[in-house]
């Protein structure tokens, strides 16, 4: 199995599906999508799932898709971010799935580094720490304390850290192998 990981790592041929649930977020969406499009890991598909926006966000999704053929847009009646994520999962074509909230932006090497970390460890999930930024672009205090160094752990240990509120439970910091979801 490790050989498969390393083959994908060196060729960057593994498709990563990035799902973005979208609802009435006209002011932030373009920055979010640009940060995903600008990833150093180029083999991405970006699924914008418009969850019944009423402010023009749905139209912006369509315009963004016209600019980059990696973007696919799905419009659905409002049902909440979980139903939007689930629709994105069902439409994803990638071997890996990641999530980004529509008011967030990500660093250019996020998916490359996370995929390479998972490949090196032979795991089906990798997680990054995150910073929360306020409206004035100042860093907020940590929601959870990030580890001081890289850690490899079992699924059971990872769940324990989440249950003890010692880990980050954000969907947006961890791509997951699609086979892990099925």
Where on the chain are the PLM-derived regions?
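Nucleotide-sugar donor-binding/catalytic module of glycosyltransferases
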Residues: 2-181
């Amino acid at each position: 199995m490790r050989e498969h990981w390393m083959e994908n790592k060196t060729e960057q041929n593994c498709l990563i599906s990035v799902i973005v649930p979208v609802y009435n977020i006209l002011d932030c969406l373009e920055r979010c999508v640009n940060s995903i499009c600008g990833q150093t890991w180029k083999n991405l598909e970006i699924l914008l799932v418009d969850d019944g926006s009423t402010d023009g966000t749905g139209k912006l999704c369509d315009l963004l898709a016209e600019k980059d053929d990696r973007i696919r847009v799905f419009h659905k009646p409002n049902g909440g971010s979980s139903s939007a994520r689930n629709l994105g999962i069902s439409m994803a074509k990638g071997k890996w799935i990641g999530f980004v909230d529509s008011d967030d932006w990500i660093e250019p090497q996020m998916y490359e580094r996370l995929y390479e970390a998972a490949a090196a460890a032979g795991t089906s999930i990798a997680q990054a720490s995150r910073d929360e930024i306020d409206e004035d672009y100042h860093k907020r205090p940590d929601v959870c304390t990030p580890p001081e160094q890289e850690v490899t752990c079992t699924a059971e240990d990872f769940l324990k850290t989440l249950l003890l509120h010692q880990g980050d439970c954000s969907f947006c910091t961890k791509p997951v192998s699609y086979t892990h979801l099925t």
